[in-house]
Amino acid sequence: MLSAVLAEAGTGGAGLDVVDAGGGTGGFAVPIAEAGHRVTVLDPSPDSLAALARRSAERGLEHRVHALQGDLTDLPVLVPAASADLVLCHSVLEVVDDPAEALAAVTQVLRPGGRLSLLVAGRAAAVLARALAGRPDEASHALTDPAGRWGRADGAVRRFSPEAVQALVTGAGLRVEQVHGVRVVADLVPSALLDAEPGGHAALLALERALSDRAPFRELATQLHVLAVRP
């Protein structure tokens, strides 16, 4: 979905103004900048931003990648209102204090017609993973816990169902365009089995693509990817 948005924007030649909230060392930002877009990376970690600066400099992208230190809720203070064509918020909503407040901040910096790429941890995947690990009590806890956690030792702060994350997005004033599952079955397949099967990895990738937007498989994904637009 994200590649399609960037490719569509690239046809005009001007490129996009992109904000990568929680972008860290630039795993998404640097390739996006290399594609001709302008990227502002917001992250609370000075070490990650220093690594981003080095990575950008090595590729001659200093003019396209701009680093800001702060949290997601700082976004409206650090980035002008209605200035972003695209905001990436990947694996961030799980750890913020208030997901609704965080998405409201994103809405403020998006231009009308601008898009949000949101990636969050899926609740159902945690339930299934704990059950397959022989931990039915933890699976039951993840199923009923308001935050989708399987117990005190769970390192995740919260997980989402497709319905919950879509409700948050629409509550922030955005319109959901697409919802896809990421790693629907990939985390359940032993890599040794794929290595032993000729073409196994390619076949798994094709299966992932086929399952990613189909219910009920999408709901089982390790992560949920939501693409939304500001009306």
Per-region residue spans from a language model:
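Class I SAM-dependent methyltransferase SAM/SAH-binding core
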Residues: 27, 31-74
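A conserved beta-strand element that flanks and buttresses the S-adenosyl-L-methionine
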Residues: 88
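Conserved alpha-helix/loop element of class I SAM-dependent methyltransferases that forms part
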Residues: 1-14
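Conserved class I S-adenosyl-L-methionine
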Residues: 15-22, 115-145
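Conserved Class I S-adenosyl-L-methionine
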Residues: 178-231
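A short glycine-rich, Lys/Arg-flanked "PGG" loop and its adjoining helix->strand segment in the class I
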Residues: 100-115
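Short alpha-helix
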Residues: 156-173, 179
